[in-house]
């Protein structure tokens, strides 16, 4: 027994020494600055329940690009839009992969658009982009437009009854129903409860996955535990199998009824594009569909929830939006906003952009991995295998790019330049160029246009028809809750008052 203890202690000492050497050794003369790590944990002990805030504070000490250790995962944090473009656009080939960690591998095994790597990603991106181009634009518009009609009908019922309206519930239903129609050509009834109906079959497991993986796990980034952690997930995690079971039912139905020459929805198009010859084809289709649900519902619904919050807290801005929409529609003789009205409603677009900036939904986006060691601008060395993340809140709160960044001011997106208040000099960087909520480069959000259309149509028609007020006449709490997405901490409700159009 004593011998076993001695062996264990010896192995532990060797492990800690090896782990320390890895973290403390000099990599390159241009290696990035960063906080001093400790063995095993790296810099994890310096992160709180709001890690994006902690990393933003580190920016003040180490600059707009620095390194931290998430246990054994060397991570590069970037808060400079110029450097982001040099990395994600000019050197895209070196940063197109995802980190090889258990949570990224589990469930999809690097299939689909979000998790695939290398040439597999090139093929997947090409197929999905082609599939989306083949989706009839008119059909996509009708999908979103019909869901807006359903949403307006529901909100009118709440307004007539003078009942508080919960944005989170109904914005989730709106985005989920649009995705069901777009991908599966299925209609979700206006009266369907998202906690008991068809939506719940995918939303329940999705929410649990985001809750389980959203805050990260030490075992994910501790090299010694990664193999065991992946096996643990495969044996105990129940939600991804439920998601695949849900998808498989739709997939089998589509295989039985598909007419390749006249696809009904995105799933039909994906089946046509990928084929059904191998299990890899199936996994790519399944993973791509789930990618759309994960990326295209929670982020859009949360942004709409924030729009409700900001309109209730900033009634003067809400009135300005309403006046712009009402005046424009009166001029052209319509009573509803359509997609082709977007260019004529710049303030509506500016409010959506400012909400995405002021209340960013994703703190870091989906991380990238460095394929080969590289030096950016001859002074920023990034080693092979490094994880790369963008700290969006740090960029969006930076006075260098957004004057009076702590103020909710949509008019900034109606201007062409910003002023650097620190030096009182005009910034050479256009605020719109620093505004990258959907990431940039070849691996940016593939569903960006769909999301923008969803947001614009819903928001413009909501403010056209209703005045949004807090239930008690006070400002709604804007505190956030950290996870895969940054949501309002409180599931708030609002009162709706009918506007005269």
Swiss-Prot record:
Signal peptide location: none
Sites where the protein binds heme: 445
Cofactors that this protein relies on: heme
Bilayer topology: Single-pass membrane protein
SUPFAM superfamilies the UniProt entry points to: Cytochrome P450
Any GO CC annotation of this UniProt entry: membrane
Chief localization: membrane
Protein family (similarity comment): Belongs to the cytochrome P450 family.
Protein's recorded name: Probable cytochrome P450 508A4
Organism per entry: Dictyostelium discoideum
């Amino acid at each position: 027994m004593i011998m076993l203890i001695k062996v264990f202690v010896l192995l532990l000492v060797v492990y800690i020494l090896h782990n320390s050497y890895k973290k403390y050794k000099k990599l390159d003369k241009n290696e990035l600055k960063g906080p001093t790590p400790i063995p095993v944990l790296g810099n994890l002990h310096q992160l709180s329940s709001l890690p994006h805030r902690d990393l933003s504070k580190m920016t003040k000490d180490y600059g707009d690009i620095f390194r931290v250790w998430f246990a054994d995962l060397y991570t590069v944090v970037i808060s400079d839009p110029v450097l982001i473009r040099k990395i994600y656009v000019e050197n895209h080939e070196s940063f197109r992969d995802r980190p090889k960690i258990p949570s990224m591998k589990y469930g999809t095994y690097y299939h689909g658009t979000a998790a695939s790597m290398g040439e597999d990603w090139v093929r997947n991106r090409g197929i999905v982009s082609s599939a989306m181009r083949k989706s009839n634009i008119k059909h996509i518009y009708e999908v979103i437009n019909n869901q807006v009609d359903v949403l307006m009908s529901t909100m009118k019922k709440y307004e007539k009854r003078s009942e508080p309206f919960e944005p989170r519930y109904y914005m989730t239903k709106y985005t989920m129903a649009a995705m069901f129609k777009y991908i599966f050509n299925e209609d979700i009834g206006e009266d369907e409860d998202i906690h008991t109906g068809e939506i719940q079959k995918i939303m329940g497991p999705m929410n649990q996955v985001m809750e389980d993986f959203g805050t990260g796990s030490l075992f994910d980034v501790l090299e010694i535990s990664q193999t065991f952690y992946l096996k643990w997930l495969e044996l105990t995690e129940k939600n991804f199998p439920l998601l695949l079971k849900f998808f498989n039912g739709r997939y089998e139905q589509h295989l039985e009824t598909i007419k390749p020459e006249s696809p009904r929805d995105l799933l039909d198009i994906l089946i046509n594009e990928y084929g059904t010859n191998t299990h890899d084809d199936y996994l790519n289709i399944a993973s791509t569909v789930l990618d759309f649900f994960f990326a295209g519902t929670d982020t859009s619904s949360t942004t709409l929830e924030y729009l409700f919050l900001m309109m209730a807290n900033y009634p003067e801005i809400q009135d300005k939006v309403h006046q712009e929409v009402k005046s424009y529609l009166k001029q052209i003789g319509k009573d509803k906003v359509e997609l082709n009205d977007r260019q004529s409603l710049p303030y509506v677009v500016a409010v959506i952009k400012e909400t995405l900036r002021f209340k960013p939904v994703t703190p870091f986006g989906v991380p990238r991995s460095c394929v080969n060691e590289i030096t950016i601008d001859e002074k920023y060395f990034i080693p092979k295998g490094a994880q790369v993340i963008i700290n969006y809140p740090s960029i969006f709160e930076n006075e260098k790019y957004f004057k009076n960044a702590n103020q909710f001011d949509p008019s900034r997106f109606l201007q062409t330049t910003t002023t650097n208040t620190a030096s009182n000099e005009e910034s050479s960087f256009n605020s719109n160029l620093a505004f990258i909520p959907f990431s940039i480069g070849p691996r940016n959000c593939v569903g960006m246009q769909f999301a923008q259309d969803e947001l614009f149509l819903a928001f413009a028609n909501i403010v056209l028809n209703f005045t949004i007020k807090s239930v008690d006449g006070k400002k709604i709490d804007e505190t956030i809750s950290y996870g895969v997405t940054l949501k309002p901490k409180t599931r708030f409700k609002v009162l709706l008052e009918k506007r005269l159009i």
